Amino acid sequence: MKKLSVFLLGALMFGGAIAAEDAGASDASLTLAVRRIGLEWSKTEVNHAAEYQNSPVSALKADSQDFIKGVFDTALEYNNNRFQWDNSLFMEYGETKLKPYNESATVSENADDILLSSNLSYACWEFSGFKFGPTVRGAYDTEFKTADGTPRQNIIRTNAGISLFDNEIVKSLYLTGVYEYDFTYAGEQTSKLAAEIGWRLEYQIREGVKLSSNGYYREYLSYSEFVKTDLERDLSAILRLDTNLWGDLTMGPYVQYRRARARGVDVYGSNFIMGISFNYITSFGLI
């Protein structure tokens, strides 16, 4: 925890110095950005499947299932000249309910995450519509509930590195070093060091149609303890196309991919989802 304390103190001093420098700037803005409040849902309902188990028509003998996931992604964005400070809350939770015709229904989680983060960036240089400079970040990563007898994830994560940001398309593109303090398992608290690259991109194809992507790749370099479920590599990526339906309501297809490998496993685990999402996306200028 000593490393974490030193890092956070440095981040606060960094942010305070920048804020003091920009205090006299006239172009300060504070925005509440609702990046996405969304619902992803699909339902398959099959009636009288028992009578059609010998049918060559798969649709008549399939298992009924429900898939639903909710996403809440907001940020309080402060900009003052070269200084940018974002405080964000990301939450998602989803379940899949499977109902075979001759068995009891089963429910499994397909998503569960709560991420509270604060990010400070400073533009030392500006070129071609890009801002470039140092960035620091602190985050707390946890879950709504436990599943299948496993403990609830609890991780404090800090990043420091360089970033391109505040561009019309490249909202954030960063390369950082990472320090994690993982206290998911009681009695097995672990400190980890990693390298991470991440992005948040938005492209306006035409009025009312926007393509967006966000994600990260994290490579772990060292650990204070051996915990077989700790990840060695972790990739998460989302690609979404939003089309305005009415006002700030959008609908569109999305692709989500997660691939990772744990220390105690020889093969990669992955999760690939394609679907349609309904979203509410807007922003409110506070200053």
Regions found by a protein language model. Name each.
Residues 176-244:
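Outer-membrane beta-barrel transmembrane domain signature
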Residues 42-69, 99-106:
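Surface-exposed strand-loop-strand hairpins of Gram-negative outer-membrane beta-barrel proteins
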Residues 36-47, 80, 91-97, 138-146, ...:
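Transmembrane beta-strands of outer-membrane beta-barrel pores
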Residues 10-18:
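Hydrophobic h-region of N-terminal signal peptides that target proteins for export
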Residues 230-287:
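Predominantly the C-terminal beta-signal and adjacent terminal strand-loop region
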Residues 21-33, 77-86, 123-133, 165-173, ...:
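Short loop/turn motifs that connect adjacent beta-strands in outer-membrane beta-barrel proteins
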Residues 68-74, 114-118, 154-160, 193-199, ...:
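Hydrophobic, lipid-facing positions within transmembrane beta-strands of outer-membrane proteins
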Residues 97-198:
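Outer-membrane pore/translocation modules
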